[in-house]
């Protein structure tokens, strides 16, 4: 069902199946990612209700954006020391196939 929905929404032409965001709850390098989640996650999820968007918190992990596509292909973008706006641009690039 999520795969069918992803085929109609963002990243549809690329076969996007899932977005994962890894971050640390406390590190300064993850602050922009935490800000992004607080300010923009709800809007992103409302616009894409059937696309799995997973948030994974882990102590001392480097913040990273993962996108999983059809046939198990994955791309990742490091988000260390990014601002919330830079995280937004990184997500847009992944969704458009530029990353």
Swiss-Prot record:
User: Chief subcellular site?
Assistant: mitochondrion
The UniProt keyword set, sorted, is: Acetylation, Disulfide bond, Electron transport, Membrane, Mitochondrion, Mitochondrion inner membrane, Respiratory chain, Transport
State the membrane topology: Peripheral membrane protein
Q: Which residues carry this modification: N6-succinyllysine?
A: 64
Q: Which residues carry this modification: N6-acetyllysine?
A: 64, 75
GO term, biological process aspect, one: blastocyst hatching
Please list the residues that carry the modification N-acetylalanine. 2
Which cysteine pairs are covalently linked by disulfides here?
A: 24-58
Cellular component (GO) terms are: mitochondrial inner membrane; respiratory chain complex I
One Pfam family hit: L51_S25_CI-B8
Instruction: Give the quaternary structure.
Output: Complex I is composed of 45 different subunits.
The similarity comment for this entry is: Belongs to the complex I NDUFA2 subunit family.
Question: What is this protein called in UniProt?
Answer: NADH dehydrogenase [ubiquinone] 1 alpha subcomplex subunit 2
Question: What does the record give as the organism's lineage?
Answer: Eukaryota, Metazoa, Chordata, Craniata, Vertebrata
């Amino acid at each position: 069902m999520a795969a069918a929905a992803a085929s109609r929404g963002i990243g549809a032409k690329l076969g996007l199946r899932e977005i994962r965001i890894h971050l640390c709850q406390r590190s300064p390098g993850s602050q922009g990612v935490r800000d992004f989640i607080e300010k923009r996650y709800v809007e992103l999820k409302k616009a894409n209700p059937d696309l799995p968007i997973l948030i994974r918190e882990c102590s001392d992990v480097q913040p990273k954006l993962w996108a999983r596509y059809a046939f198990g292909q994955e791309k990742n973008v490091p988000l260390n020391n990014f601002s919330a706006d830079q995280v937004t641009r990184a997500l847009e690039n992944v969704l458009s196939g530029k990353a």
